[in-house]
């Protein structure tokens, strides 16, 4: 689990670690009592190649959309850079991605092999930070890559989640 958001947030959120003299430390079941939507959380130390972010949740019964943003802080004025915005649009079954740098949105990417989300069903999104790109997995299947548009990965230190979903776990 080295490099995961859970590990980096464990101390900040007061998560206990279990250990015994015969085994290495084990991450306790993580419970975030404040996983309400909209959600805004800090990524300790920012991102770097090798770091992963896990988002688990359940899509609402009649969803329109939801989005996951990794941002460079949570400033509204001036607006923080958005390193990646993942937006699930249920009406046209699109999983869109884009970035906003210095106040300007880039070109939106939309091609996917299939739409992975189903109303009233659980999902698991993993965002793997690699040197040139983010690699996005949904329910264990790689769905697409998104090449970095923000130069300083360590500046990407905030996760924001909003829309028609319930969060069950972040890691």
From Swiss-Prot:
Record domain Galectin: where: 38-170
Name of one Pfam family that matches: Gal-bind_lectin
GO MF entries: carbohydrate binding
InterPro entries registered for this protein in UniProt: ConA-like_dom_sf, Galectin-like, Galectin_CRD
Record field: transmembrane: none
Source organism, top-level taxon: Eukaryota
UniProtKB keywords: Lectin
Functional description taken from the UniProt entry: Does not bind lactose, and may not bind carbohydrates.
Protein's name according to its UniProt entry: Galectin-related protein B
Gene name for this UniProt entry: lgalsl-b
């Amino acid at each position: 689990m080295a490099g995961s958001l859970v590990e980096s947030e464990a101390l900040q959120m007061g998560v206990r670690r279990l250990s015994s003299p015969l085994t290495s430390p084990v991450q306790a079941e993580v419970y975030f009592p404040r996983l309400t939507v909209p959600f805004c959380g800090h990524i300790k130390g920012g991102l770097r190649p090798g770091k992963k972010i896990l988002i688990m949740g359940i899509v609402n019964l009649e969803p329109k959309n939801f989005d996951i943003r990794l941002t460079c802080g949570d400033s509204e004025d001036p607006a923080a850079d958005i390193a990646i915005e993942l937006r699930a649009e249920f009406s046209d079954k699109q999983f869109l991605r884009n970035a906003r740098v210095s106040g300007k949105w880039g070109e939106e990417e939309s091609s996917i092999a299939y739409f992975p989300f189903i109303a009233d069903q659980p999902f698991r999104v993993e965002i793997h930070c690699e040197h040139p790109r983010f690699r996005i997995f949904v329910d264990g299947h790689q769905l697409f890559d998104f090449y970095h548009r923000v130069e300083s990965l360590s500046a990407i230190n905030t996760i924001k989640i909003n829309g028609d979903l319930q969060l069950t776990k972040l890691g």
